[in-house]
Amino acid sequence: MRNREAAERRGRAGESLAALWLRLKGYRILARRVKTHAGEIDLVAAAPFGPVCFIEVKARGQARSAAESVMATQQARIARAASLYLAGRPHLSRRGFRFDIIAIAPYALPVHHRDVWQAEF
């Protein structure tokens, strides 16, 4: 159980760091840890003068491996959750959307991978 608790703490810390990083870049955090019956979205943010971003945060030993760690099944689950999130917020739907990954690695600045995959709904 300790490993799971430690992983949960690392995940929350990574999400907090990613949210701070986004705010410093001018993004507005709309939601954290959005849970739907389709899945969970780590962060939802509004890009400055841009789309709504659904962001998966990955804490890894190396930032490079994080973007590759979100497989097609997880992408589909996040896309379904994003669809449900936007369905209840039509004012956000008009902005467009994209799917991003933020990689968190020890002793390094976060790496923001924009528009990593596409989804239609």
Predicted regions and their residues:
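Acidic-basic catalytic patches of nuclease active cores, encompassing PD-(D/E)XK
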Residues: 1-32
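Positively charged, solvent-exposed patches that mediate nucleic-acid binding
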Residues: 24, 47-49, 92-93, 121
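Protein kinase-like catalytic core scaffold
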Residues: 39, 51-53, 100, 111
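Short, solvent-exposed loop/turn elements at beta->coil junctions and helix N-caps
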Residues: 32-35, 100-102
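Conserved catalytic cores of phosphodiester-cleaving nucleases, focusing on short active-site segments
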Residues: 22, 41-45, 49-66, 78
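Mid-chain, well-packed structural core segment of small domains
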Residues: 63-93
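Short acidic/glycine-enriched loop/turn segments that link adjacent beta-strands
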Residues: 37-40, 107
